[in-house]
């Protein structure tokens, strides 16, 4: 194996990514080196491409980015015991310290020292990625590479959707991006009574409808209260999944929740936006922030959903070779795509 590899690198502090040859990551005693088969583009990667304010203060330059992937093990460290070369795997992109109070209590997803693959350390937009043995997740043979490559965002959807009991509940999802759509699919699969998804992008709403979400609402043209009445809802929503990061959508969600409603918040809203806290108080709403996946219960549930027949592959709208990465990023930046999966070989 050569000691150099192709990779997409944030090599300059400006808009874009560049295909370069960089050293293959070194494998420590507890590490696993994975040959990447497929990578998917995340919204985080778009922020890094755009070199926005968050990226400028977060991403060291140069950096191999990316964190959504599927591949096969190419090399294992001297202390690795669970895995073998050739095994097909994905991996958890949040690397936790294992020493803080939350980690020691089995709540690794709450680790205050979390490092992100492709954010704080080299990522998966390369021919190889290296992660700790504890972050490796084996992929069953009946799950395709491209589906395993989007398990990171699917995990965000599963974690958010399953934050509260959904059986018989009326669920509002704000934001019909890939994670919002998958969250709505999980809610429907998990026994929700009514699942309504809102957005202002007709292409995303069309994709949501194609994937089986019965009630899609263009918030720029339709009144959500009228839609609720038309589908037989006489009270507010029991559960809200805020996936958009859009302040108007969040405010509308709070307004349409039933008393005692529960909201899981994954979307990252702009700084300084306002909500009516009086409604939160007097409706006695329960708000819960969501970040990443519960390790590794969410992964177990994802695999169970897919093996049980939940088909999330139509969320993938673009499949491209890695040399066409610019096309993939333009699709993501347009806001009119679902997931974009890039093939490394």
Swiss-Prot record:
Q: How is its cofactor bound, per UniProt?
A: Binds 2 Zn(2+) ions per subunit.
Name the domain of life this protein comes from.
Bacteria
Q: Alphabetically, which GO biological process terms does the record hold?
A: L-threonine catabolic process to glycine
Q: Which UniProt keywords apply?
A: Cytoplasm, Metal-binding, NAD, Oxidoreductase, Zinc
Positions with a binding annotation for Zn(2+) 2: 97, 100, 103, 111
Annotated GO CC locations: cytoplasm
GO terms, molecular function = L-threonine 3-dehydrogenase activity; zinc ion binding
> Where along this sequence does the record place binding of NAD(+)?
179, 199, 204, 266-268, 290-291
Q: What is the lineage of its organism?
A: Bacteria, Pseudomonadati, Pseudomonadota, Alphaproteobacteria, Hyphomicrobiales
Residues annotated as the enzyme's active site: 44 (charge relay system), 47 (charge relay system)
Function, please? Catalyzes the NAD(+)-dependent oxidation of L-threonine to 2-amino-3-ketobutyrate.
**Name of the protein in its database record:** L-threonine 3-dehydrogenase
Record text on subunit structure and interactions:
Homotetramer.
Recorded catalytic reaction(s): these are: L-threonine + NAD(+) = (2S)-2-amino-3-oxobutanoate + NADH + H(+)
The EC number(s) this enzyme carries = 1.1.1.103
> Belongs to which family?
Belongs to the zinc-containing alcohol dehydrogenase family.
Q: InterPro entries, from UniProt?
A: ADH-like_C, ADH-like_N, ADH_Zn_CS, GroES-like_sf, L-Threonine_3-DHase, NAD(P)-bd_dom_sf, PKS_ER, Zn_alcohol_dh
């Amino acid at each position: 194996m050569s000691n150099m590899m192709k990779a997409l690198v944030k090599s300059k502090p400006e808009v874009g990514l560049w295909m370069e040859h960089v050293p293959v990551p070194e494998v420590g005693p507890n590490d696993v080196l994975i040959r990447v088969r497929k990578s998917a583009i995340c919204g985080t990667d778009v922020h890094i491409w755009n070199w926005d304010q968050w990226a400028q203060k977060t991403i060291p330059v140069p950096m191999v980015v990316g964190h959504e992937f599927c591949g096969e093990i190419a090399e294992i460290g001297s202390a690795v015991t669970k895995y073998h070369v050739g095994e097909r795997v994905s991996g958890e992109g949040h690397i936790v310290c294992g020493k803080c109070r939350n980690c020691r209590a089995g709540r690794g997803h709450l680790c205050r020292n979390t490092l992100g693959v492709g954010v704080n350390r080299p990522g998966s937009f390369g021919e190889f990625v290296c992660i700790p043995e504890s972050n490796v997740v084996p992929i069953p043979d009946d799950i395709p590479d491209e589906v395993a490559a989007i398990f990171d965002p699917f995990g965000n959807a599963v974690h958010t959707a399953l934050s509260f009991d959904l059986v018989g509940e009326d669920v509002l999802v704000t934001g019909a991006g890939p994670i919002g759509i998958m969250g709505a699919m999980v809610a429907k699969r998990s026994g929700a009574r009514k699942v309504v998804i809102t957005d202002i992008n007709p292409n995303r709403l069309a994709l949501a409808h194609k994937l089986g979400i019965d009630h899609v609402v263009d918030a720029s043209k339709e009144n959500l209260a009228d839609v609720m009445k038309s589908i037989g809802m006489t009270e507010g929503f029991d559960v809200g999944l805020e996936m958009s990061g859009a302040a108007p959508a969040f405010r509308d969600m709070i307004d349409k929740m039933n008393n005692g409603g529960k909201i899981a918040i994954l979307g990252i809203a702009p700084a300084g936006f306002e909500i009516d806290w009086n409604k939160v108080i007097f409706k006695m709403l329960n708000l819960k922030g969501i970040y990443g996946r519960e390790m590794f219960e969410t992964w177990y549930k994802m695999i169970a959903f897919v093996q049980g027949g939940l088909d999330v592959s139509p969320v993938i709208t673009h499949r491209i070779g890695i040399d066409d990465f610019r096309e993939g990023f333009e699709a993501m930046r347009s806001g009119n795509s679902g997931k974009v999966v890039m093939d490394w070989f």
